[in-house]
């Protein structure tokens, strides 16, 4: 086992793969684990970052804290030099959320006086200015995230968002001198919120705070920390800067596309994909709940189609509001169970490419497939890599958060995983 520098814990699987992809892009060899690894995991000597994917975003608070601390303690036993709590670039956490409680618990456990709160991911339009989180130039609370079915975001000010959850205070340091930030943080534990509008801002933040033993944020900052690491210590990787060679992003065999996200971008991606002639099957909450639709019936339909059929539960805000009258948690659980079951059956029947849209859906799919460790390959879009289970080298998984990717994302993912790419 090599010397582990970065130890990252993410609150869902797509967030974990997002973070891992930015580390790989920076030149940091990375392995991703689905859940806390058993015993002492084995990975290559070159590995410098370990990312652990949990499913704690909407978990009851006490369980989320306990599981997250267990993951961080595992990383400390791997002798990780720096710990990182990865959450979504749109924060995705209400007053009942877990970002604050988990970060508080880590700071208490290791006597950490302060850390940063940096959800920004400029390449995907997530930026912070004067403590306000923006999505493509629009304050978070005025963006489509306002109507997220599980974590509706009704406030754009990061101070308010974190202080609703945390025992500690938060301070906006904006674009002020990082030197002054140290004095701002003196005293009781607190969170510092710098301006972060560009990748250059990320590099500046990483340069000043890069020696902290614990940081929090999105994949933008972890990418900047990766670049700092490579600048200081060099990189083992050459050529594609990927833990999996480019030519191995492809796999022969049939593909299945699953979409459980109701984000505005996923809805556009579905429209683009079906507009290109893709066959699709929509899951309806009432029919899933009364048994008219189930895994076996839907998979029988899939087997009658050519490769690349789309199964989706994604709905407009209006349709979503109607379906939630059936019980928000009940509907969400049934949809996740169905899509995960379809992924499992597809893998059992020899499908080698599974594309998934939606963070909660992706977490359910990875749990259903049962693979624990993944190598990270090249990215279909920023933060969305092609992944290969170490236990099944023929399978390619592409799992994305709902808002990530281009409108033609599904087509791109199928093309990238279905043909040989030019070796470097």
Predicted regions and their residues:
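Conserved, well-ordered active-site substructure
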Residues: 351-352, 360-409
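Cap/lid and interdomain-hinge subdomains that line or gate substrate/regulatory clefts
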Residues: 2-5, 48, 64, 72-204, ...
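Short acidic, glycine/serine/threonine-rich loops at helix termini
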Residues: 19-21, 95-99, 126-134, 184, ...
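C-terminal structural cap/anchor segments
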Residues: 302, 307-357
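N-terminal basic/disordered segments at the start of proteins
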Residues: 2-46, 66-67, 120-123
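A structural-propensity feature for long, helix-poor, extended segments
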Residues: 48-56, 305-307, 388-424
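Glycine-rich, highly charged phosphate/nucleotide-binding loops
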Residues: 36-39, 60-74, 338
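Conserved, well-structured core segments that form the ligand-binding/active-site neighborhood
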Residues: 136-301
């Amino acid at each position: 086992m090599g010397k582990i520098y970065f130890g990252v814990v993410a609150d869902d699987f797509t967030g974990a793969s997002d973070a891992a992809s930015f580390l790989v892009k920076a030149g940091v060899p990375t392995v991703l684990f689905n859940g806390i690894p058993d015993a002492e995991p084995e990975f290559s000597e070159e590995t410098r970052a370990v990312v652990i994917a949990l499913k704690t975003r909407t978990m009851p608070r006490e369980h989320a804290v306990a599981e997250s601390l267990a993951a961080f303690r595992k990383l400390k036993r791997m002798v990780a030099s720096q710990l990182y709590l990865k959450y979504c670039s749109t924060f995705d956490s209400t007053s009942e959320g877990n970002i604050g409680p988990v970060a508080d618990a880590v700071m208490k456990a290791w006597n950490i006086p302060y850390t940063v709160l940096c959800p920004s991911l400029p390449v995907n339009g997530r930026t912070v200015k004067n403590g306000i989180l923006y999505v493509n130039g629009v304050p978070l609370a005025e963006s489509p995230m306002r109507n997220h079915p599980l974590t509706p975001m009704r406030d754009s000010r990061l101070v308010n968002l974190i202080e609703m959850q945390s025992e500690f205070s938060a301070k906006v340091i904006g674009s002020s001198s990082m030197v002054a930030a140290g004095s701002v943080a003196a005293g009781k534990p607190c969170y510092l919120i710098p301006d972060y509008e560009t990748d250059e801002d990320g590099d500046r933040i990483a340069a000043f705070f890069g020696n902290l033993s614990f940081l929090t944020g999105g994949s933008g900052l972890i990418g900047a920390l990766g670049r700092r690491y490579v600048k200081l210590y060099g990189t083992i990787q050459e050529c594609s800067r990927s833990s999996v060679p480019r030519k191995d992003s492809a796999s022969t065999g049939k593909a299945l596309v699953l979409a459980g996200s109701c984000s505005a971008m996923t809805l556009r991606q579905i429209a683009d994909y079906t507009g290109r002639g893709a066959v699709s099957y929509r899951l309806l909450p009432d029919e899933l709940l009364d048994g008219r639709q189930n895994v076996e019936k839907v998979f029988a339909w899939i087997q009658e189609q050519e490769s690349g059929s789309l199964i989706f539960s994604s709905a407009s805000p209006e349709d979503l509001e109607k379906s939630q009258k059936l019980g928000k948690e009940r509907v969400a659980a049934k949809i996740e169970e169905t899509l995960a079951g379809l992924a499992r059956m597809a893998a059992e029947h020899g499908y080698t490419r599974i594309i998934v849209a939606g963070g909660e859906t992706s977490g359910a799919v990875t749990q259903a497939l049962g693979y624990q460790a993944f190598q990270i390959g090249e990215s279909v879009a920023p933060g969305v890599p092609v992944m290969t289970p170490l236990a099944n080298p023929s399978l390619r998984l592409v799992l994305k958060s709902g808002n990530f990717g281009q409108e033609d994302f599904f087509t791109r993912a199928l093309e990238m995983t279905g043909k040989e790419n030019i070796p470097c």
